[in-house]
Amino acid sequence: MAKQRSMYICSECGYESGKWYGKCPGCGEWNTMNEETLAVKSTGTKRSSGGYASRPLKRLSEITEDVERRISTGIHEFDRVLGGGIVEGSLVLLGGDPGIGKSTILLQACQHLGQHHTILYVSGEESANQIKLRANRLGVTTDSLYILAETDVGSIAETIRSEKPDIVIIDSIQTMVYDQVTSSAGSVTQVRECTNIFMHTAKTYGIPIFVVGHVNKDGAIAGPKVLEHIVDTVLYFEGERNYSYRILRGVKNRFGSTNEIGVFEMTQEGLLEVENPSLMMLSGRPKNASGTCVACVMEGSRPILAEVQGLVTATGFGTPRRMSTGFDFNRMAMLIAVLEKRAGFFFNTMDAYINVVSGLRLDEPAADLSVAMALVSSLKDAVIGDKVLAFGEIGLAGEIRAVSHCEQRVQEAGRLGFQRCVIPFHNYKSLSRDLKKELDIVPVRTVRDAFSALTVKE
């Protein structure tokens, strides 16, 4: 006989406590501890195996290396982020803001997957008629797609066991409920238990399962943090509502590389792949304008060029204002301090703004030099050449430090018509002779050297 006990669980991080806290000891958030009733098995009750059959032990040397079989989604950018396709028996979590396109990309993938595989689409948010309307708009006409409007996890798991579909899509995990848990749908306990059941089902029958997840106000997957540890792959769908572009980013992948991205454009017909993101990021760049510089960052194995815009104006307040969009604010403040101390460019009476065009977020330190160039270009009202690109990490001593994949970055710049590349001095030796002949490559050691190497006109 199961006993009932109450626990207070944080809705943000999943921290559990026997008493209520105003501030969660785990994540520090306020008013996130919610009371939930848990079922606990009484002492002496035989613990079930959870549906797992005991298996004989195997030595590592006895295990054969089977080539993993991947299933292509038919969307090249999607396959890139997944590591080459869908792995059998994997559990993939896809998160993103409401209306960003999570359900859209999965439904579009069903059109190609349905040519050779059967797909079960489980919806807890929409009716079958609503899904049909959206499928018609996206041009999804496959007969291998089956719709199930259900939220009970036990019923869904039984359907998977009996029907044996090749691929399962759960939309969304926050609407699923497990009848052995008394809390409401979307609670920490419900999300955790439902995910465990889907993981068990995926591994037992070798069926890949996609799980759609909502995000909280901070942009993280809503529910316990352990949710991301349970699944095999975590994908984030990012994008600003004011932009038509969407970025699919992989942050965890047990079967491929992480930090890969796929770029899409949202249209009336659905999501379209952007095969050349660099060209898209640089489209519409102003001519002969100060305060703009092109950066080259690595997103996984792909070099991407992005325009960084800086604006420096006289402040109207006692304390200068700093604002950054698409670039870390604290790192921007550090770069301004380095420019003042090491290069003699003073911003103490100036407001400074940084914007990365097209909604891209630059997390790599290699973007430091481009951000610094954009700020100084605006400060001095000097125009950086249209065909000039710069990348490199800036240290606190004002030095330009080496970055990885330098040759790939320079090759991408040359392919898009750039003529001059300002790069870290320590990366220059690793470049091939052909690249050095094709492009005007300027190696620099310090911030001062970088600005003196620029061709600018005031």
Predicted regions mapped to residue ranges:
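Divalent metal-dependent catalytic cores for phosphoryl transfer on phosphate-bearing substrates
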Residues: A128
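P-loop (Walker A) phosphate-binding loop of NTP-binding proteins
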Residues: D97, G124
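Peripheral, non-AAA+ core regions of ATP-driven protein-machinery
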Residues: A2-E12, E16-R80, V87-L93, I100-C110, ...
